[in-house]
């Protein structure tokens, strides 16, 4: 049989807990690859009692002897990359041998960060809540064919290409009448670019396909979540890349028929960062409880996340678009003390009920809930699925019946060991 690339994806609005799961899954793989996104999303991993937030570096970095790839669909901020790599090096993880970067990955320039802030300021109250890292403007340049790529670092024309891009950006900033000072940022960026040149800068599409030909196992890890996908998410409150499974093909150069298992991660409830529609959002004390017990604050930004009940309409939509083969449920333990737990199984829009994710989500939409009795106990004391309380198993099996996909991994606590595999 042909080796295939397995994929792990968030099925909600990001922050599903991918860091921990990738940690549980990576031992099975020889190669771990990132295929989209930039340093806006942080994966929090605990390793030997230390906490690390990885933003652009794949999570396979903690397991020695693995190859980690930053694919062509990723955008890289040299400054943040250097900070991240140096912090890892200080704790004994030498990346220069373990990490390869695609020549075709795009670079976030200092002026991209400033453009991000300028565009957001110009929007006033219509902000989409960007993380201000320059990711949107970098993808804009990529699509309008003005971008700079990692491979340009190896070109004798590098300085000229940079100067042209910078001049273009300065023109835009002038028209937006935005005041800024770039000297310090630019100095850091040029130093960081020198640092980036030490790494293996490769034709990653050949590399990935060579690995498959050599029967190596590969895991592609997504950042963010399906409902933030530029095509299928709640546009315009989305990210600038394709976060769905198809993004693996375009972001790594893997053919669609070489995609294997698709692991879909979801939280037992829902959260969303920043602005944008969120049908099951709770504005009451229950929402506060989910946030506090679940420690729902951003890994990179520290922003408080909006919380709500599990949205089955959205989950089924994500499963369909990604072709999910196995589900992974995170943070079940957050609801250990709840008397009643709800799941949205349909939406009511203007007097009619639908189980489809609509083109537009507005204030008219009301979720239709199915109620469950809480399990009211600490799930960590059980070692096997069979031992779980009936109430919890009813919740899990309801999700399986509704989606038609098995829930294979259940996380019952923050620790790596607090994971039940079926």
Task: Enumerate the language-model features and the residues they cover.
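Non-transmembrane, aqueous-exposed alpha-helical and coiled segments at domain scale
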Residues: 2-422
